[in-house]
Amino acid sequence: MQDLSGFSVPKGFRGGNAIKVQLWWAVQATIFAWSPQVLYRWRAFLLRLFGAKIGKNVVIRPSVKITYPWKLTLGDYAWVGDDVNLYTLGEITIGAHSVISQKSYLCTGSHDHASQHFTINATPIVIGEKCWLATDVFVAPGVTIGDGTVVGARSSVFKSLPANVVCRGNPAVVIRERVETE
């Protein structure tokens, strides 16, 4: 059984020193979160200032939560909706023209349940280009979602998904191919 008295965060795990982490959290809770909806470039600037790789014309809502922006890459024209949580203990990459809809949660971190000291770990998440994660989708550590894939509302993605398909469910399963109409 677990004994949390022996838990510790591995050295370098956060990717930044304690001052950088606390400064980001203060900025995120104030001038990032309080900025008007339309100030997408302002929020992109703040994220770049803290080491995020942000493409052009990215839409990031002010209520988005990002644990460590220096572990985030957003492609050109990516959209990140209201109340999305990007739990960047590990790297998160969101491809160009992809949409992460409101209340979705991308979780790169977990704990080893077999470890007595509940060891923390992180595995990257990659969302391909031209994807759409609909409202309230959960994406687990280590998942890759192929280019052009749609994940339906309130789905949970625990395994990687192929390109150009429509998926839904808990766990998410492929329903059909995604076919462009234009």
From Swiss-Prot:
Pathway it works in: Slime biogenesis; slime polysaccharide biosynthesis
Gene Ontology molecular function: O-acetyltransferase activity; O-acyltransferase activity
E.C. code: 2.3.1.-
Biological process, per Gene Ontology: colanic acid biosynthetic process; lipopolysaccharide biosynthetic process; single-species biofilm formation; slime layer polysaccharide biosynthetic process
Domain of life assignment: Bacteria
Pfam families for this protein: Hexapep
Cited CDD domains: LbH_wcaF_like
Top EC category: transferase
Keywords: Acyltransferase, Lipopolysaccharide biosynthesis, Repeat, Transferase
Family (UniProt): Belongs to the transferase hexapeptide repeat family.
NCBIfam families: PRK10502.1, WcaF
Name of the protein in question: Putative colanic acid biosynthesis acetyltransferase WcaF
Source organism of the structure: Escherichia coli (strain K12)
Lineage, opening ranks: Bacteria, Pseudomonadati, Pseudomonadota, Gammaproteobacteria, Enterobacterales
Gene transcribed to yield this protein: wcaF
